[in-house]
Regions:
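Active-site regions of oxyanion-processing enzymes, predominantly non-cytosolic
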Residues: 148-152, 191-196, 269-290
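Active-site His/acidic residue clusters
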Residues: 156-166, 248-251, 277-311
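Active-site nucleophile/metal-coordination loop of metallo-enzymes that catalyze phosphate/sulfate
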Residues: 15-166, 170, 199, 207, ...
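Glycine-rich tight-turn/loop motif centered on a GG-T
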Residues: 168-169, 211-220, 252-263, 295-303
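Metal-dependent active-site segment of extracytoplasmic phospho-/sulfohydrolases and closely related
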Residues: 9, 13-18, 301, 305-342, ...
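Short, small-residue-biased leader/transition segments that mark boundaries at the very start
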Residues: 1-7
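Substrate-binding rim/cap in mid-to-C-terminal beta-strand-loop elements of soluble/periplasmic
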Residues: 342-383
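Extended, H/D-rich, highly charged conserved domains that either
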Residues: 165-166, 173-242
């Protein structure tokens, strides 16, 4: 098996979808394929590192050759959970199958009934109620809030209800109380959102509004123990890089490293590989593929971001020691050529690399992302309670 040797440091980076999910029709995502369509739009991608690892074997990707002797094990994974959001995908990687999905309101905004209930319980009206970036929503409604004291509420492609409030107009404790009220309302299965976020800001007018550090998240914690908890309880390091600590609400995390971009995330991962003698898992979420390019339906930008990632991946691989294991995978698709702005239900790649590997090949596709958590726990001889078997 790929994990027959013992690896001291395991590094998991998450990236992008490769189409063909068996249940794509249930999500109205038939025909989506993030990487294939980006390759077509960009007239081929130049990703020599991923190509040498064998990524081209996972589909028909213009510019990424199918090579006979890949340097890694490569395979396709299907998601078994209900949902195609960030939390669901990451939780499944670490062993949890979500049956009742988190609900997203990307294309519709929250229903009137939800908003009315929130307005009644908080005593203020709402404006916004669309999927929007944090800066744009403030430029659109900030001045209105200065005049009226109405809540600014908005969402994104993930399962979130965000409430923006100017710190001089609405006191922080009132904002936090409103978030608790929203969290309570959003426990209803019809409106079940993964997280409610307080988004306080300051500033005097359009173009001058800035968010403050007083953000607060009211997230649903994983509903059972994950592989991260199992590792932590057995005294292994679990380093969460990027959004990982938020996604797991800090559960099972022993060290947090914040990032501001893909490049920053990869640089910090390269630093970890170079300088941190940890024993356990480093779990990295690269934010830009999704936020900057997938949701904004910018295929060219996405392609350039994959090429940049490929350059940094080579540097990371050069820093790996003989007893390191690297996995590159994804939590969902986000086809930038598809309608709407939402994630897309797709298979995801799993590329597993170590300098110790003697034979490398394409493995059969598997039916859950949970094999990632299973394989990591198996390596460290930690009992795994989640879905999926070690490979």
């Amino acid at each position: 098996s790929a994990a027959s040797d013992v690896y001291k440091r395991q590094i998991v980076c998450d990236s992008m979808g490769i189409g063909n999910a068996k249940d794509a029709d249930k999500y109205d995502d038939l025909g989506t394929n993030t990487v294939q369509h980006i390759c077509e739009k960009c007239d081929g991608l130049n990703v020599p590192t991923l190509e040498k690892l064998g990524f081209g074997l996972l589909g028909d990707f213009k510019g990424i050759n199918k090579i006979s002797y890949p340097k890694a094990y490569v395979m396709k994974l299907n998601e078994v959970s209900n949902g195609k959001d960030t939390m669901t995908g990451h939780w499944e990687m670490m062993g949890l199958k979500t049956v009742k999905p988190f609900i997203t309101f990307t294309d519709t905004g929250f229903p009137d009934e939800f908003i009315k209930l929130f307005e009644e319980k908080t005593g203020r009206k709402c404006v916004g109620n669309i999927a929007c970036s944090g800066t744009k929503i403030l430029d659109t409604y900030g001045e209105h809030q200065l005049k009226t004291g109405d809540w600014i509420v908005y969402t994104s492609a993930d399962s979130v209800f965000q409430i923006a409030a100017h710190e001089d107009i609405i006191p922080l404790d009132e904002l936090y109380k409103a978030c608790e009220i929203a969290r309570e309302i959003a426990m209803d299965d019809r409106w079940k959102v993964g997280r409610v976020i307080a988004r306080p800001y300051i500033g005097s007018g359009e173009g001058q509004f800035t968010r403050t550090a007083n953000r607060h998240d009211y997230a649903l914690a994983p509903f059972a123990k994950t592989a991260l908890d199992d590792l932590k309880e057995n005294n292994f390091d679990v380093i969460g890089v990027g959004k990982i600590p938020d996604i797991f609400v800090d559960q099972g995390i022993t060290k947090k490293i914040r990032t501001v971009s893909n490049e920053d995330g990869m640089n910090k991962t390269i630093e970890l590989a170079k300088n941190e003698d940890f024993n356990g898992l480093a779990f990295i979420n690269l934010v830009d593929f999704d936020a900057m390019y997938g949701h904004r339906r910018n295929a060219i930008g996405y392609g350039q971001a994959i090429e940049s990632f490929d350059n940094q991946l080579k540097i990371l691989i050069d820093e790996l020691k003989d007893d390191d294991l690297l996995m590159v995978t994804a939590d969902h698709g986000n086809d930038p050529t598809y309608k709407g702005t939402d994630h897309t239900r797709e298979q995801v790649p799993l590329v597993i690399y170590s300098k110790q590997f003697k034979d490398h090949k394409q493995l059969n596709e598997e039916n859950t992302f949970g094999i990632i958590g299973a394989t990591i726990c198996d390596n460290f001889d930690v009992k795994y309670n989640g879905i999926g078997k070690s490979i």
